[in-house]
């Protein structure tokens, strides 16, 4: 391993010990905000410190085994050669782990996220599929103990959704769900199809990190056009009495956000502004990412949200993840929320791309 990497790891080890000492300080314990921040930092350092300690131990084992080679005893020499082989193999594995653990992390990976699902080509069948995707993500969120809150929903005429926007809150939400952005295609026989022909429909999924208020882009109120209207859908008689739904248009960018899920106009406005801030930030991030990747296309984290990323083929029970040429015949499990079988390989591919970019740099 390079000396520069070893020095960085030693610095992280020292910082880990500092943080551990601070966490037992009475003043820090009394300051809940600082205690939480340090606890989070300690948790983030834990894996890399554990791997680095194991790496150091393997180095010591290798040195001891090499000393043993100088012995005259033939059995000891044989044992030493075996231990050297094991120690070198362990060092190779740990070096790979440490390289991945030291990769630059997207600071937004720990953020909550807005998940948008929109029906595309395919009419009613696309809306029904959007409903199926929403159910799939709901199951995945339940498995991860994440909270889902519907911000806006426009239901399809025959089920599902023309569009649905939800906020997902929890640990590491954006870091996992960001890989879902893109075009999702379904191939299946609709219930209304009497000939048994397979139809193809599509939905677009967009995942954006929630931007904390302190970090949010300043939005000039003069750049906003705000309309109120009566909410449609669930809500009983209430929906006919008050203009509680909100539509906000950001004039410079043309971005439009609607929120009508809350009964209070004030709450709908707050939610709409939160989604608007995330969308504007996403556009800014997209511009920057495009500039950074002008010389190198990132296979997995491609910003092209219209790009087809996945196909769900119901007759064959198959899911195809096009970005990494992954095919799984586990469609029913995936639709029930078992997304880690896809997200795990996507994350690994992303890490490999980052490592390649670092080595090129």
UniProtKB/Swiss-Prot annotation:
Modified residues (N5-methylglutamine): 237
Positions of disulphide bridges: none
Compartments reported by the entry: Cytoplasm
Record keywords, A-Z: Cytoplasm, Methylation, Protein biosynthesis
Keyword Protein biosynthesis tagged: yes
Pfam families (UniProt xref): PCRF (PF03462), RF-1 (PF00472)
Gene3D superfamilies xrefs: 3.30.160.20, 3.30.70.1660, 6.10.140.1950
MF annotations from Gene Ontology: translation release factor activity, codon specific
Region (Disordered): 284-306
A GO cellular-component term linked to this record: cytoplasm
Modification after translation: Methylated by PrmC. Methylation increases the termination efficiency of RF1.
Main subcellular location of this protein, as a coarse class: cytoplasm
Record PROSITE patterns: RF_PROK_I
Keyword Cytoplasm in record: yes
Composition bias type Basic and acidic residues, residue spans: 284-296
Role summary: Peptide chain release factor 1 directs the termination of translation in response to the peptide chain termination codons UAG and UAA.
Family designation: Belongs to the prokaryotic/mitochondrial release factor family.
HAMAP family: Rel_fac_1
Matches recorded under PANTHER family: LD18447P (PTHR43804:SF7)
Protein name: Peptide chain release factor 1
Organism in which the protein naturally occurs: Shewanella loihica (strain ATCC BAA-1088 / PV-4)
Gene transcribed to yield this protein: prfA
């Amino acid at each position: 391993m390079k000396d520069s990497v070893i020095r960085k790891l030693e610095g992280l080890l020292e910082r880990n010990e500092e943080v551990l000492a601070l966490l037992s300080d009475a003043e820090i314990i009394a300051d809940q905000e600082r205690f939480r921040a340090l606890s989070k930092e300690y948790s983030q350092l834990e894996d890399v410190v554990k791997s680095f300690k194991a790496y150091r131990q393997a180095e010591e084992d290798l040195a001891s085994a090499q000393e043993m080679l100088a012995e005259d005893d033939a059995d000891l020499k044989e044992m030493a050669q075996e231990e050297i082989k094991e120690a070198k193999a362990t060092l190779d594995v740990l070096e790979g782990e440490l390289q991945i653990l030291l990769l630059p992390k997207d600071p937004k990976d720990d953020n909550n996220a807005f998940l948008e699902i929109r029906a595309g080509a395919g009419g009613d069948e696309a809306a029904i599929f959007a409903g199926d995707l929403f159910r799939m993500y709901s199951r995945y969120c339940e498995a991860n103990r994440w909270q889902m809150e519907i911000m806006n929903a426009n239901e399809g005429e025959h089920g599902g959704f023309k569009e649905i926007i939800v906020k997902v809150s929890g640990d590491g939400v954006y870091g996992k769900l960001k890989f879902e952005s893109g075009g999702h295609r379904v191939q299946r026989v609709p219930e209304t199809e009497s000939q048994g022909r397979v139809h193809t429909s599509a939905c677009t999924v967009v995942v954006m990190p929630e931007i904390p208020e302190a970090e949010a882009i300043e939005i000039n109120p003069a750049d906003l056009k705000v309309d109120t209207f009566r909410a449609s859908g669930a809500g009983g008689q209430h929906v006919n009495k008050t203009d509680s739904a909100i539509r906000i248009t950001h004039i410079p960018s043309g971005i439009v956000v609607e929120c009508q899920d809350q009964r209070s106009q004030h709450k709908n406005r707050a939610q709409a502004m939160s989604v608007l801030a995330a969308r504007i930030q996403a556009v800014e991030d997209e511009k920057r990412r495009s500039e950074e990747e002008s010389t190198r296309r990132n296979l997995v984290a491609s910003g092209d949200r219209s790009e087809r990323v996945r196909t769900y083929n119901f007759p064959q029970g198959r899911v195809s993840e096009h970005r990494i040429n992954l095919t799984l015949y586990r469609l029913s499990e995936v639709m029930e929320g078992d997304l880690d079988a896809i997200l795990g390989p996507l994350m690994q591919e992303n890490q490999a791309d980052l490592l390649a970019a670092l080595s090129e740099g």
